[in-house]
Swiss-Prot record:
It is found in: Mitochondrion inner membrane. It holds the Pfam family COX3. Keywords: Membrane, Mitochondrion, Mitochondrion inner membrane, Translocase, Transmembrane, Transmembrane helix. The gene is MT-CO3. This is Cytochrome c oxidase subunit 3. Component of the cytochrome c oxidase (complex IV, CIV), a multisubunit enzyme composed of 14 subunits. The complex is composed of a catalytic core of 3 subunits MT-CO1, MT-CO2 and MT-CO3, encoded in the mitochondrial DNA, and 11 supernumerary subunits COX4I, COX5A, COX5B, COX6A, COX6B, COX6C, COX7A, COX7B, COX7C, COX8 and NDUFA4, which are encoded in the nuclear genome.
Amino acid sequence: MTHQTHAYHMVNPSPWPLTGALSALLMTSGLAMWFHFNSPSLLLIGLVTNTLTMYQWWRDIVREGTFQGHHTPIVQKGLRYGMILFIISEVFFFAGFFWAFYHSSLAPTPELGGCWPPTGINPLNPLEVPLLNTSVLLASGVSITWAHHSLMEGNRKNMQQALAITILLGIYFTLLQASEYYETSFTISDGVYGSTFFMATGFHGLHVIIGSTFLTVCLLRQFNFHFTSNHHFGFEAAAWYWHFVDVVWLFLYVSIYWWGS
């Protein structure tokens, strides 16, 4: 590559956007095949392809930013704008679920018994597992902030401890959510209540798993001395994403678990 006299990163040709698009096609097609023909093979191929693509693409980004020095302050600014736009798109994604929930619950139709929750649905007690889940996620928000402050102060040990605590709390939340799903008396096919409940909380649970994975990668990178107090966008993006997951859960708890019950 020729010597560059500017602060922008001129990326090399990469196969990962193409393989990522193909894996997305395989996953969506495979999901339809699984639903309609009970054949998960195409979906599994798509998931494996997507996982390999993400690993190798992000490996390249880590290499470019950490070892090759391509992530200059201007490049980091662009990455921050990209992450902010991504989180905004996620906000609208969840807004659709909340819209569906309130559209159905504020004016229940005669088919639902004219009431909410619909006739025959026994909602979960918001003061039991959902409240514990809320406490767990709020605690994880505190620990991720502790990790960020420790990183800014150059305290590696505290940063690693706080990040490990956050990951463990994320795993604990996922296990609690799984046990809650196992104990519910209704399913995703039990009318609009089941559909909106499991779609909204399920997609949030998926985001918790993604966020926990993101933070685990950050912890491994921290063990390998990838982050400094002025060069740590990977961790910063993970922290933003985790705070977003926290805030979405608060809205889910107040809307679906507390008000909706």
